[in-house]
Amino acid sequence: MSQAPMATTPRNYPIFTVRWLALHTLGIPTVFFLGALAAMQFIRR
């Protein structure tokens, strides 16, 4: 991901904001769900 030349133009910040929003709305519940599944493996007796 060579995005260094694109960072010089100040018009690209909504694109990065939407990408950040999409990655975190999908990524944070996924990591939380995988952590919950991993925790359930240790809780099971």
Curated annotation (Swiss-Prot):
Signal peptide: none
An example Gene Ontology CC term for this record: plasma membrane-derived thylakoid membrane
Keywords (A to Z) from UniProt: Electron transport, Heme, Iron, Membrane, Metal-binding, Photosynthesis, Photosystem II, Thylakoid, Transmembrane, Transmembrane helix, Transport
Presence of the UniProt keyword Heme in the record: yes
Gene Ontology terms for molecular function: electron transfer activity; heme binding; iron ion binding
Cofactor remark from the record: With its partner (PsbE) binds heme. PSII binds additional chlorophylls, carotenoids and specific lipids.
Cofactor field: heme b
Localisation: Cellular thylakoid membrane
Subunit relationships: Heterodimer of an alpha subunit and a beta subunit. PSII is composed of 1 copy each of membrane proteins PsbA, PsbB, PsbC, PsbD, PsbE, PsbF, PsbH, PsbI, PsbJ, PsbK, PsbL, PsbM, PsbT, PsbX, PsbY, PsbZ, Psb30/Ycf12, peripheral proteins PsbO, CyanoQ (PsbQ), PsbU, PsbV and a large number of cofactors. It forms dimeric complexes.
The family this protein is said to belong to: Belongs to the PsbE/PsbF family.
Identification of the protein by name: Cytochrome b559 subunit beta
